[in-house]
């Protein structure tokens, strides 16, 4: 069991959170949730021993092991991929290292012989003889091919290194497992594999994720970090949302009743306190008022941006016609002879494993990349709004937030229209004076949504738009795209996002491109996957 006792973390004058006392155990899987900036990752670092709290402490049962998903993807460059995974089990790795050292000696002393015999017993008890096989299986699960297993980590591409570190955390199979954003950099199929692996484990887990479907599939409890406090609810994310909403509504309703009661008593006191015959009753009611205590309703750190995408000019019939489209690089074509006819109003989800060509397809459709062959023909009146996955180039100038958004004013827009958009997207009057380039990833994402709101395109193309967003922004974006009347083409690894939006699926595989008319759940059923 992992226990936090009166944990407080303070940066500057205001505490990030305070007096958190909670027990994590029993093989439960806790989803640690809260708005960006509420302190989730900070609290996770404190639980893992990587950060000292301002006050309080964290204790782990002495016979239990703790494991965690590391974020330092360049820390193992000189090790093989397989060894990096095995290093997740610290005790096993240390025994293996000492055992290998003794066997590598030119001559083994009698003392070395006794020592290595003891090490062999420990190695066997920790299933060391199957370590490479188990590590290899996990690497295949996260998408690392066999030919890379014995190579150095330095040859694994950034992003994919994080997959190796996920395999490392899973290999540890500890009593307590801490996972901070384990689905980052994973495609939708690998996330489904991870859900199955975690559900088969007996470890107590604490998981930070913005993937609602993942939290629903894996978590048995939700730990909500809000109001500077931590509250634990039984159930998955959807069940938590219902329970938390009902609890807050009950609190507000109880306070409303108490306020009405106070007002009624106060009215009596005001009318009759000077009346000699009723002064005792007035005094009694005044005492009743003193006894009524309103529950404190703290301001939530959660805020939902207001996102709505409108069309300036509607299209009719076909939005896009693609014929014989082929695009590749030095290693050959990513997709070949792709034909696609997209009708107005369709919402097309482009799926596939990482590196298969999803972003390349979108870049080719918008003209950022030229096809090797084939044609891309948009409707004559198409007005395209594009959200690129890598959009840092849009923020390289020195414009303030207000100046940056003002670039996208349309005919008839004034300064107030820009301020209105920024306000809906949760940027304060102080925020809009900041340089846009210093904004966080989530804030830059909201800025790009504002750009698209001002442009009023009739076709939206979005490449991983939920990256860096908090849960509230994801849900607001999800609703905005559900209400959008135009045509949508998007890439996402968020299962809930894809399931709720897609009316058509385009899956790119190394062998072919699959075009399926229907939603994602229907597509999975067509493949025999539930």
From Swiss-Prot:
TM region positions: none
One Pfam short name: ABC_tran
SUPFAM superfamilies documented for this protein: P-loop containing nucleoside triphosphate hydrolases
Alphabetic keyword roster: ATP-binding, Nucleotide-binding, Repeat
Binding annotation for ATP 1: 34-41
Annotated ranges, domain ABC transporter: 2-252, 320-526
Family in the record: Belongs to the ABC transporter superfamily. ABCF family. YbiT subfamily.
Full protein name: Probable ATP-binding protein YbiT
Source taxonomy: Bacteria, Pseudomonadati, Pseudomonadota, Gammaproteobacteria, Enterobacterales
């Amino acid at each position: 069991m992992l226990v936090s006792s009166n944990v407080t973390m303070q940066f500057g004058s205001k505490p990030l959170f305070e007096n958190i006392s909670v027990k994590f155990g029993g093989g439960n899987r806790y989803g640690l949730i809260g708005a960006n900036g509420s302190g989730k990752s900070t609290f996770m670092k404190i639980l893992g021993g990587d950060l000292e709290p301002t006050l309080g402490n964290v204790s782990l049962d002495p016979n239990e092991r703790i494991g965690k998903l590391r974020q330092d993807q360049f820390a193992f460059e000189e090790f093989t991929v397989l060894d990096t995974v095995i290093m997740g089990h610290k005790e096993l790795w240390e025994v293996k290292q000492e055992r290998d050292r003794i066997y590598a000696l030119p001559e083994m002393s009698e003392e070395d012989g006794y020592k290595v015999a003891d090490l062999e017993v420990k190695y066997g008890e920790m299933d060391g003889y199957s370590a490479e096989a188990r590590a290899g299986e996990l690497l295949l699960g996260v998408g690392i091919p066999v030919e890379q297993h014995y190579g150095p980590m330095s040859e694994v591409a950034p992003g994919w290194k994080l997959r190796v570190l996920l395999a490392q955390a899973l290999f540890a199979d500890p009593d307590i497992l801490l996972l901070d954003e384990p689905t980052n950099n994973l495609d939708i199929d690998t996330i489904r594999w991870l859900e199955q692996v975690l559900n088969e484990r007996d470890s107590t887990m604490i998981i930070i994720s913005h993937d609602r479907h993942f939290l629903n599939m894996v978590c048995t409890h939700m730990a909500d970090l809000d109001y500077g406090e931590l509250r634990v609810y039984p159930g998955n994310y959807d069940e938590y949302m219902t329970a938390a909403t009902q609890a807050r509504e009950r609190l507000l309703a109880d306070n409303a009743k108490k306020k009405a009661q106070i007002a009624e008593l106060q009215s009596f006191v005001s009318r009759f306190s000077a009346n000699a015959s009723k002064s005792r009753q007035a005094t009694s009611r005044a005492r009743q008022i003193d006894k009524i205590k309103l529950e404190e309703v703290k301001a939530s750190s959660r805020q939902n941006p207001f996102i709505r995408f409108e069309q300036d000019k509607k299209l009719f019939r076909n939005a896009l016609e693609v014929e014989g489209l082929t695009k590749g690089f030095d290693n050959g074509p990513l997709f070949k002879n792709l034909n696609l006819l997209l009708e107005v109003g369709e919402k097309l989800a482009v799926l596939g494993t990482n590196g298969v060509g999803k972003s390349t397809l979108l870049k080719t459709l918008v003209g950022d990349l030229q096809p090797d062959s084939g044609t891309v023909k948009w409707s004559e009146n198409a007005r395209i709004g594009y959200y690129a996955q890598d959009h840092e180039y849009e923020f390289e100038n020195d414009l303030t937030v207000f100046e940056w958004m003002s670039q996208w004013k349309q005919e008839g827009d004034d300064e107030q229209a820009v301020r209105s958009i920024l306000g809906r997207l949760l940027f304060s009057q102080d925020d809009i004076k900041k340089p846009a380039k210093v904004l966080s990833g989530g804030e830059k994402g909201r800025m790009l949504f504002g750009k698209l709101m001002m442009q009023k395109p009739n076709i939206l193309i979005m490449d991983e738009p939920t990256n860096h967003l908090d849960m509230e922004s994801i849900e607001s974006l999800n609703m905005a795209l559900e209400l959008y009347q135009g045509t949508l083409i998007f890439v996402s690894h968020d299962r809930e996002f894809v399931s709720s939006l897609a009316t058509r699926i385009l899956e790119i595989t190394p062998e072919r491109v699959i075009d399926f008319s229907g939603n994602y759940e229907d597509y999975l059923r067509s493949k025999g996957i539930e």
